[in-house]
Amino acid sequence: MALPSSSLSSRIPTGPHPLTHTQCIPHFSTTINAGISAAKPRSFYLRWGKDSQPKNLGSNKIIACVGEGTTSLPYQSAEKTDSLSAPTLVKREFPPGFWKDHVIDSLTSSHKVSAAEEKRIETLISDIKNIFRSMGYGETNPSAYDTAWVARIPAVDGSEQPEFPETLEWILQNQLKDGSWGEGFYFLAYDRILATLACMITLTLWRTGETQIRKGIEFFKTQAGKIEDEADSHRPSGFEIVFPAMLKEAKVLGLDLPYELSFIKQIIEKREAKLERLPTNILYALPTTLLYSLEGLQEIVDWQKIIKLQSKDGSFLTSPASTAAVFMRTGNKKCLEFLNFVLKKFGNHVPCHYPLDLFERLWAVDTVERLGIDRHFKEEIKDALDYVYSHWDERGIGWARENPVPDIDDTAMGLRILRLHGYNVSSDVLKTFRDENGEFFCFLGQTQRGVTDMLNVNRCSHVAFPGETIMQEAKLCTERYLRNALEDVGAFDKWALKKNIRGEVEYALKYPWHRSMPRLEARSYIEHYGPNDVWLGKTMYMMPYISNEKYLELAKLDFNHVQSLHQKELRDLRRWWKSSGFSDLKFTRERVTEIYFSAASFIFEPEFATCRYVYTKMSIFTVILDDLYDAHGTLDNLNLFSEGVKRWDLSLVDRMPQDMKICFTVLYNTVNEIAVEGRKRQGRDVLGYIRNVLEILLAAHTKEAEWSATRYVPSFDEYIENASVSISLGTVVLISALFTGEILTDDVLSKIGRGSRFLQLMDLTGRLVNDTKTYQAERGQGEVASAVQCYMKDHPEISEEEALKHVYTVMENALDELNREFVNNREVPDSCRRLVFETARIMQWFYMEGDGFTVSHEMEIKEHVKNCLFQPVA
């Protein structure tokens, strides 16, 4: 793709989309300044090397270090210099390309996808489709704790039997070998002790299971002390409320437990302190998370008042335990209906909360998207999101559709995913979770928050639209929290026990939304994703439709399959580069691998192979043309080259130097080939369209060449106006768009064309991020125009640091606007919208820390290229 070394651009005009040839080309003067020979070179550049650093000798001189000697050149800060003698051209050299054939051969995997693997991919896709299609109220595992509370309920007919005898039997049959109750594959002392205590009390109340009780007591005595070694962040929700209350009950029942353990005393003290701070009027005023733990508040609850806060489904915040406690106190029929509803689903046990329908759908969609396999499930994803959106609330959502207490975790996840899929959702929903100090918390009016929910808020904050200050506040707040969490091992995590949440946080902070690419995120998340992750509610629970081995298996097979296709395409493109004679061009950069990587990082799907070829070839041309017009060609020769493109006349190459002859001939032949294929795809001739796109680019390069020749520093606005073309990104995108699998009408092309705000923002953000990382080096090479320098010219009173800050502000605001264009431009096919938006993102990624295009081999970028293109996932 086009990643020019010279700087150009800032504010882009927003006029209507021109369609005709004469309308499309901006009016760029090709008249050479009177005092300058058009046949002489226009600029000087430093040789590449550690000793070739520019030395500033004041406002009027720059010395270029070239070999053993130096070249002193006048530096003019005036707008134009009419009598400037042409400076001597010093050959510019780039660092050599890292990706030589032997390097690529040593990295390329010999693995080929077998027929059995292809069959397995098909099977997994079918299985996962069935997972999505079977989503109802949520799939989850049994909660021994909640089942014990439901088993307590006496028969409503007055007999001395449990209302749900099957739950009592489940407790008797599901004690673990160590005497505890809970999930056997994962030991969390908090969870096991809580569930074991609840089951022992229930068995004691029904005077059954003496053997199980005895084993449970033994477990409690030997293992309870381990709680002191566990992080506070692993303490289940409401533990300090329900555990002391049950201990008190156990003591009354005569269970022989170590009530004097220090941690037990500490938990009791925490409960008392919390209840002292609890205004009773709040308990009944509106739904809060206290409804989730009413079984631990029985001595203070006014049961008639609390009934007013019952959910529509009859539950109390979807908790079977809390609902069972209310039923035993009130006999409320809706409570009983809810419990019957849950048992009808699960048979002889209940989960820790139910339903989980919104949570399940959102996280399943997020999982397949982050793993890079979402393209296989477009219909299923739409159905899931339609369901979530139908239950969206401007106050936020919780984990279930009728949950009266919204949480920031589900709300932020929903806001981000729904917005990116084109649903109309407002960021104002986050205001529900912001306190008077500007801090964000998981639940309204509480101070609880964890790493996972703050991570989701942070991810959400990056899809902001212009003017959404709440998103900016959320970004700053969560970045601060997450960076502190990385320094505090105990901060991981209040709501989930994940395989590598730390790795997820590190990736999100280093590669936020505008600096991450789909293929890179997939590679990273494949490593971080845990198919056996568990969540923490009142007890530990699992979500098999979110954490599932099948997702991971498909992601790995699919990644490696696509990677093998990419390796073949890259070999083809490298052969094309060599056969074209480009290796003989010493004035330009050989970056075939980096350019192909930029395309494969986002348009990676097998069906877009032709688009990747075109994107890569056109990007290579724009780099060559940029280097040609930027420093190598004389103005006479450049005008001849531009005339050749305008006339589309191969005979003009006879008047060109050899290097230009190579460039023009290969451009001519390649564009003709692309046009033939484009005609097949679009059903109409596209050669004129492609030539027009190229003419516009060369006109912009010509203007830039004139600026360089005359040492002219344009105003910020003038600089930006030309940058909408000279950045070259639009050239690549507008031609590649013809191969995205859609028939593009003139109307659609206008919505991504030169006059569209969408394309302008892509160009603007790409140019500005380039300038922020290259302007100093290019200034040392004699370049006089960049966003920073032009803004300083307009505002001579400001410092360079202030100018740079302004450029960053313009860019960040433009990225927010780009979000809005990407999301709302629904008349443009998805593949075309992606092409524009992801091209903007790859620029942010390449220039995140420096000039990652020119010197990628010296940066972390090299490892990402390896991971994306060469190293299969295990």
Swiss-Prot record:
Motif residue range(s): DXDD motif: 407-410
One GO molecular-function entry: magnesium ion binding
Binding site for Mg(2+) 1: 626, 630
Binding positions (Mg(2+) 4): 407, 409
Cofactor(s) this protein requires: Mg(2+); Mn(2+)
A GO CC term assigned to this protein in UniProt: chloroplast
Subcellular location: Plastid, Chloroplast
Binding-site residues, Mg(2+) 2: 626, 630
Motif DDXXD motif positions after renumbering to this chain: 626-630
Transit peptide residue numbers: 1-37
Catalysed reactions listed for this entry: (+)-copalyl diphosphate = isopimara-8(14),15-diene + diphosphate
Keyword hit for Magnesium: yes
Broad enzyme group: lyase
Stated name of the protein: Isopimaradiene synthase, chloroplastic
Species name: Picea sitchensis (Sitka spruce)
